[in-house]
UniProtKB/Swiss-Prot annotation:
Subcellular location: Mitochondrion
Organism of this sequence: Arabidopsis thaliana (Mouse-ear cress)
Transmembrane segments: none
Gene label: EFTS
Job of this protein: Associates with the EF-Tu.GDP complex and induces the exchange of GDP to GTP. It remains bound to the aminoacyl-tRNA.EF-Tu.GTP complex up to the GTP hydrolysis stage on the ribosome.
Keyword annotations from UniProtKB, A to Z: Elongation factor, Mitochondrion, Protein biosynthesis, Transit peptide
Origin: domain of life: Eukaryota
PROSITE patterns xrefs: EF_TS_2 (PS01127)
Name listed for the protein in its UniProt record: Elongation factor Ts, mitochondrial
Protein family according to the UniProt entry: Belongs to the EF-Ts family.
Taxonomic classification: Eukaryota, Viridiplantae, Streptophyta, Embryophyta, Tracheophyta
């Protein structure tokens, strides 16, 4: 702008002196004394002379149009763009300056900058975040949205996106066309899903992938959708969900979901739902790995048996005694990892199998647990602690 002020006056004087001769009419009277017609005079003017004069005029006017607004107006524009985007003030001002203080253009520029920054940060570890749960009559969906810090996980924009994604996850279709059960899905299936957002900072129709990128730009962190699960029930059943460390309904750091199936048309759904809610809470606290001891994987069984046998052999007892020790400890192992064998956290005098049997008697119809799911934010992701030593956390 210093250059503009330096050159504006001499160029303006030149432009004024040339253009005023024509606009005042004096030049035309001089022309009339030398040429019979104005067209003869125009034909005598060197090629490009008129366009040169006109170009100088446009050049001068461009300086006045690019002049920045007053300081008070600048602050108002910065405030408006900051409220619209929640971007850092330095980025807001940089975009406004780049776009000659055009608010709409600066908002588009911020989005472009944000996508570039989000791309650069995508390799950083994102082990914090939130689980979001949505439920309708026949399904429960849970998604995990990750970020780098707990500070961002508590942000209302981040939480709004997580809840919106969970609601849309109810539309995911199982590739196996299964009627009931647990269906896991990842980014490759969900990222191109359409989202219709209605938030002051993120709104309009977009995709899951673009919405995550936009929120990452606003937050200034790596934000990513990691995984999702969909649990469906049969027609005669109940789905119950529990969220631990929940900042608001539908959000939490640990989720437990249980599916109960009842035979026949049972009208005592309230009792079934009560036990279902208690079981979902139990799943979060007790961390079962398998539904029943019959469903413990052969690999897990073999590994545990080998460990228990090695421990028993160190006692120096005979082979028959060792086998009894191993079998006794295996029963303890089942009580730890199999849901139906676990002690009920609300009443440890009974196990889950007894709890469900008592429920069947109460409602007058056989009830069984068909599926359960436990999900925790960041499980299985290597985290860098203060010591910079990676620690693997596996479910």
């Amino acid at each position: 702008m210093a250059f503009a002020r330096a050159v504006r006056r001499p160029i303006g004087v030149f432009y004024y002196s040339v253009s005023s001769r024509f606009s005042s009419g004096n030049e035309y009277s001089t022309v009339a004394s030398k040429f019979e017609t104005l067209s003869q005079y125009k034909s005598s003017v060197p090629s490009g002379y008129t366009s040169l004069v006109r170009g100088f005029g446009n050049f001068i006017r461009s300086f006045s149009s690019e002049a920045p607004p007053a300081v008070s107006d600048q602050m108002s524009l910065i405030k408006q763009l900051r409220e619209r985007t929640s971007a850092p003030i330095k980025d807001v001002k940089a975009s406004l300056v780049e776009c000659n203080w055009d608010l709409e253009a600066a908002q588009k520029d911020l989005r472009k900058r944000g996508k570039v920054l989000a791309s650069k940060k995508s390799s950083r570890t994102a082990a914090e975040g939130m689980l979001a749960v949505a439920q309708n009559e026949g399904k429960v969906a849970v998604i995990e949205l990750n970020c780098e810090t707990d500070f961002v996980a508590r942000n209302e924009i981040f939480q709004y996106l997580a809840l919106a994604m969970a609601k849309h996850a109810l539309l995911v279709e199982s590739s196996s066309q299964q009627v009931s059960g647990v269906f896991p899905f990842g980014p490759e299936l969900f990222e191109e899903f359409k989202l219709n957002l209605d938030h002051p900072k993120v709104n309009g129709e977009t995709t899951v992938s673009n919405a995550v990128t936009e929120v990452a730009a606003i937050m200034g962190e790596n934000v990513k959708f990691r995984r999702g699960f969909l649990m469906s029930k049969s027609s005669a059943g109940v789905l119950s969900a529990y969220l631990h460390t929940s900042p608001q309904p539908g959000l939490g750091r640990i989720a437990g979901i249980v599916s109960l199936e009842v035979e026949g048309e049972n009208t005592q759904l309230e009792a079934i739902q009560r036990v279902g809610s208690e079981l979902a809470m139990h799943v979060v606290a007790a961390k079962p790995l398998f539904l029943s001891k019959d469903l413990v994987s052969s690999e897990a069984m073999a590994n545990e048996r080998e460990i228990l046998k090695s421990q028993a052999e160190s006692t120096g007892k005979n082979q028959m005694a060792i086998e009894k020790i191993v079998e006794g400890r295996l029963r303890k192992y089942f009580e730890e990892v199999a849901l139906m064998e676990q002690k009920f956290i609300v009443n440890d005098a009974i196990n889950i199998k007894t709890l469900v049997d008592n429920l069947s008697k109460e409602v007058g119809s056989p009830v069984k647990v068909t599926d359960f799911l436990r999900v925790e934010v960041g499980e299985g992701i290597e985290r860098l602690e203060a010591s910079d030593e990676p620690v693997a956390q596996t479910a």
